[in-house]
Structure formats: C-alpha cells, structure tokens
Amino acid sequence: MRVLFLLLDMPAPDKSGDMYVHLAEQFLQNGHSVTIMAPDVVHKLSFVGQERGFRVVRVRSKETQGVKSMYKKGFALATLDYYFKEAYRKFLKDAQFDWIIMPTPPITLSGFASYVKRRSHAKFYLILRDIHPQSVWSIGLLHNRVEYWFLDQKARKGYQSADIIGCMSPGNMFYIKDQYPTLKTGELTLLYNWVKAPEFVTDKTVRARLGLEEKFVSLFGGNLGKGQRVENIAYLAKHYLPDENIVFLVIAKGVEKERLQRIAKEQNLTNIWFLDFMPQADYLNLTSSVDLGLVSINESYSVPTCPSKAVSYMAAGIPILAMINPDNDYGQIIEESGAGYWTAGSDKQHAVELFDMIYKDSNLRKKMGKAGKVFYQQNCTVEVAYETMINQMEKHQNGE
C-alpha cells in the first residue's frame, strides 16, 4: 500500500521516535510505501527529504508544541491546513496514495486529509486520540462559542470524511455515537494506545545513581498539560511528606510542569523530585525500576481518555494508580486487566487509601505489574497496533 501519514510532530532523525513514527516504521518494515508530512517551525520554506527511510515533507508552520497561549496555539493549528496544502501542491501533487493515516490532535488537519482523499482517491484512517473541542471546553481552555463551533465543524467533517475511526477505548466509541447521533461517520473501531518498548535492562545501580536506592518511588511521566491535574500529585506528596521512604519522581514536559515545580517549592514538598525529559528508551528502562506509576486526569474532563503514559507503565511491568475523571472507562480497563487501581480525581482520601494498599503490599505490586504487562503484550504493542489497523484497512478495501 501507498500510505501518507499526517503528523503534528515528528522528532528529528537523531531523536527517539514517538508512537506514530514507530507505527509508520511498522508499515515500512512490512513492505508498504510510506510518506510523512509534518510541521517544521525552524525553516521558512517547506522541503522534502529522506528521514528514517521515509519520504518526509517538512511543512513550514508556526509553533504548536509547548505554547502556553491558547490563542497562539489555536491560530497555529488553524493555519496548518493552509501550509499543508501549499506543501502538498509543491511536492506531492502527482503522488498517489491508497490510505491517509492521521491522528488527532489536531482535528484541524481533517480538511486537508479530505482534500488529499479526493485528489488521490484514497481511504482515510483517523486515529482518534483526543476528542476536540469537547475536551478543552470541559476543562476551561476554550470559552468562545464561535471558536467552539468552528472546531466542532472541523471535527464533524473529519468524522464524516474518515473511512475508519480508530478509538482508544470502548468509551470513546460510545461517546462519538452519543455526541453525533445523526452524523454518518466512518466505521468506529477499537485501537488501543501503543508503545514500542525496548528490551528492558535490569540495572540495579539506577536507583543508587539517583539517590533512590532505599526509596519507594512513584513515577509521573509524560505530558504535564492542562488536562492533567497537578494538584493530585501535590496532594499525595504533601500527605506522605512525613514518610521519608516515599518519593514522587516527575519526568515530564508540558505547560503545567512549571506550576507543579512552583507548588512544590511553595509547600516545601521535598519529596517531589524532578528529572529532565529523556529519550523514550531510557525513560522506559528507568520506569521498570520504580515501584508505582501515577496517572492524573483533570476530573472536569468530559470525555473518556486513556493516557499513553499508562501503556508505558504496563510495558515496564509496574502497577498503576489512576486519579481520573469519573466518566472515563479507562478506570474499568486497568481494573479488569488487574493492572492497578483507580479513583475519581476529586476523591483525594480514596486515592490515599489505594496508595497505602499498594505501598504496603509488595506481592500486590508484583501481581498488578505482571497483569499489566500481559495486557500490554496482548493489546498495546506497536506490532499489535499495526496488525489491528492493517486488518481493518484490508477488510474495508474488500468491502467486508
């Protein structure tokens, strides 16, 4: 197949790949022709080249990553469609594709995906990893109803244009059906988050190097944006401050990291340790040496969401404690898989009770970690993601 990936971000060749680059690599390794279009904020002109074995079109664009101003980020995302069309006409106007694969965010690129679909007579696979604008509206990041309407129209067109919509949980699938009952969308299918895990190296010195040799280490890793409730981490840290054995290790980037650092300083939470963000392979190997993985989602979130950091915890074989929005079936997933416990983010006392249970029972931690790893191996490897998608795509092409 000839496949075009539309990505919001693509790490430079000398950096570790992310989940979408790893997925594209699976397509390439299985004999498919892969082209990637991704933004470039450094150069003033778009350009095409070879990276990681792919044909890559780097599209001149405005910065969308790590932007604190929602207005600047919104404007940058809104202009992506224009810049992508410009680069497509310059470099790919005669190219033919069988499938277009695009993850969300950003839903604002769905118009461009529809444009390529018409020009190339291709099929469109939408990987739904965030549901806009409902998600940002529910946590107060979007207030203007005109902007909401604009984004909602973009979302509707994307759902209508897609031939297949890969949802990260059954709750996601139900939410789309419930929000758009009269909308004729693409086929809704289940596609869990995935991560390409390295061969984990058991490094018994890693704790000693970090000064954590005798500590109970709870890790919060990945993104720290507005969708994560940093107060949940701070609350647990404050509660367990008298216990010198417990450390909360934060390896994250995002607009809320500075706020958590400020809270930790103001409240003298010396048990919150911050490490710089690191390559994924190094991060996953470090993850395998900690005792507990933490998930925190803003309890005001109105949409079901399954954070990718939880998949990393499962891959590393560590138990999970999730403080999440109550309308989220992610809690059900980790509970039924046996990978951990969950509670509503607003129920801080229950979070403490669950933390205590995991902290005081090493056998429970081992049992949860093992169960999580089994779930990961069966559902969340990049190989499983590829096989799931390619089977769905082939069935769709065959009219099944």
List where the protein language model places each region:
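Carbohydrate-associated surface elements
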Residues: 40, 171, 191-194
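Membrane-proximal helix-turn-helix segments that form the acceptor-binding/catalytic region
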Residues: 108-111, 115-119, 145-165
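Nucleotide-activated donor-binding/catalytic signature segment of Leloir-type glycosyltransferases, i.e.
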Residues: 242, 251-252, 257-284
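Conserved donor-binding/catalytic core segment of Leloir-type glycosyltransferases
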Residues: 212-228, 233-237, 249
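A short, well-ordered alpha-helix in the C-terminal region of glycosyltransferases
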Residues: 350-353, 357, 364-378
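N-terminal subdomain of nucleotide-sugar transferases
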Residues: 1-55
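Nucleotide-sugar-dependent
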Residues: 14, 228, 279-286, 293-314, ...
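Acidic anion/phosphate-binding donor-loop and adjacent secondary structure
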Residues: 177, 194-209, 229
